[in-house]
Design a protein with these regions (language model features):
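Mixed-charge, low-complexity intrinsically disordered regions
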Residues: 2-25, 29-30, 34-36, 40-43
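N-terminal extension/subdomain marker
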Residues: 26-163
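Short hydrophobic alpha-helical runs that function as membrane-insertion/retention elements
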Residues: 228, 247-251
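C-terminal catalytic or substrate-handling cores of phosphate/nucleotide-
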Residues: 300-313
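A sequence-level detector for short glycine-anchored, His/Arg-bearing signature motifs
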Residues: 224-241
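Accessory, usually C-terminal, subdomains that scaffold auxiliary metal cofactors
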Residues: 250-296
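A short beta-strand motif that forms part of the nucleic acid-binding face
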Residues: 233, 242-244, 253-255
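Short alpha-helix boundary/capping and kink motifs at helix termini
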Residues: 110-226
């Protein structure tokens, strides 16, 4: 008895959100998720490697590479960005600032965003530069409450400066390896707050730490007159599709490009981010630049295991 791969038809969410007729569909394997990927900003070799890392079938990779060629050609014709034009303004509403201060006073937020290192601002979505090349269309469409009003960007404050939502995770212990594994669907799950304490002189040392996702804040570092999106991709996309032109966020000043949060290999290069026409956030919703690619759901795993070894005295 042979099994058949179950597939479902997934509508391009960008068309459905815009109220347009979805004339094209791609069969996506059941259990996979549709992402918008800015493949046109990759070189051909890097784009193919990126797609192959997603375990896609060769024929789909070839099809997506053809779409990447169209996107790359389109990018060459786009006008450069104007870094002299202001893309942000201070957020001055007293009630909004009080809510932001309350959230940012949380210990996890103070650790990630120390007081005095950021300001609350409204940044124009059209001029935000993404540093990562993809986002989950289905997840983005699920965010936000019914009280979001595009005519009033302050209605998005609670979404963009959010309380940390409970994150489900699984813990397993490997006693033979003296290891603990923590896994969950949140991609920002990490070790925070590492501490130690010695109970008595020459007594045992007690180590403690927390495993937690990063603060749920839309963060936009500013460097060389450009605004880069460090976190909050799905919320910004949701707001953009609802008609918001500006997003409330925590803006920090970066002295070097690496300070904007460029960690991980699946990010745009410095040459792309500082190009005359870098990626812009609305590109994710563009029918040529934002190429729909199926991704397998990923789990974040944090493994804690002590290294025990001898060193010469």
């Amino acid at each position: 008895m042979t099994s058949k791969t179950e597939t479902i038809h997934v509508v391009d969410k960008r068309r459905s959100y815009a109220g347009e007729n979805a004339s094209s569909r791609r069969a996506i394997p059941a259990g996979w998720r549709a992402h918008s990927v800015l493949l046109g900003y990759f070189g051909a070799d890097n784009a193919r490697r990126f797609l192959q890392d997603k375990a896609l079938k060769p024929e789909l990779v070839n099809e997506l590479m053809q779409q990447r060629e169209f996107a790359h050609t389109r990018i060459q014709s786009l006008p450069p960005v104007d870094t002299k034009k202001s893309s942000s303004r201070p957020l001055e509403d007293a009630n909004a600032l009080a809510e932001i201060s309350r959230v940012m006073a949380r210990p996890d937020c103070q650790g990630a965003y120390p007081e005095g290192t950021w300001t609350a601002e409204l940044v124009e979505i059209a001029n935000i530069i993404p540093i990562q090349p993809y986002l989950d269309l289905d997840y983005a469409g699920s965010l936000g409450d019914s009280d979001l009003a595009p005519s009033d960007p302050l209605t998005a404050v609670k979404l963009c400066f959010a309380e940390k939502h409970p994150t489900e995770f699984h813990v397993s212990v490997e006693e033979s390896q003296k290891a603990i594994n923590i896994s969950g669907i949140n991609p920002s799950l990490e070790v925070v707050g590492l501490r130690y304490e010695q109970q008595q002189n020459d007594g045992p040392v007690v180590l403690s730490f927390m495993v937690s996702p990063a603060p749920n804040i839309v963060s936009v570092p500013r460097y060389a007159g450009r605004h880069f999106l460090a976190s909050g991709y799905h919320r910004v996309y949701r707001l953009m599709k609802l008609g918001f032109t500006h997003v409330p966020c925590a803006v920090s000043e970066a002295k070097t490009l690496p300070q904007i949060g460029m960690r991980g290999r699946a990010l745009f290069s410095e040459a792309v981010l500082m190009a005359p026409r870098p990626p812009r956030f609305p590109d994710f919703a563009d029918m040529v630049l934002g190429i729909v690619v199926p991704f397998k759901p990923m789990h974040r795993v944090v493994r804690i295991r002590p290294d025990e070894y001898f060193v010469s005295g």
